[in-house]
Amino acid sequence: GSRSSFSPTQAFLTLQQASSTPRTGGVGSYQFVREFVPEVYLNPFSGPPDTFPDQFIPNYDIVTNSVDGYD
């Protein structure tokens, strides 16, 4: 009953090819510093994820109330 035109194997291979190479061995130090450090040190926060302040998310879009790059 799957409506997808992809078989699971095809989908997996497609995703494998599409994934960016640096992610395979974890994030590199440059990307880690860019993504992780500002979130943790400029925006100290402790609490449940659903109460995380939107303004701390750099790609949060206030108009659509969503985070850019995620469905």
From Swiss-Prot:
Isomerase as UniProt keyword: no
GO cellular component terms given for this protein: host cell nucleus; viral capsid
Disulfide bonds: none
Cleavable signal peptide: none
Induction: Expressed in the late phase of the viral replicative cycle.
Post-translational modification remark: Cleaved by the viral protease during virion maturation. May cause the middle segment to be shed from the capsid.
Matching InterPro entries: Adeno_PVIII
Miscellaneous notes: All late proteins expressed from the major late promoter are produced by alternative splicing and alternative polyadenylation of the same gene giving rise to non-overlapping ORFs. A leader sequence is present in the N-terminus of all these mRNAs and is recognized by the viral shutoff protein to provide expression although conventional translation via ribosome scanning from the cap has been shut off in the host cell.
Protein name: Pre-hexon-linking protein VIII
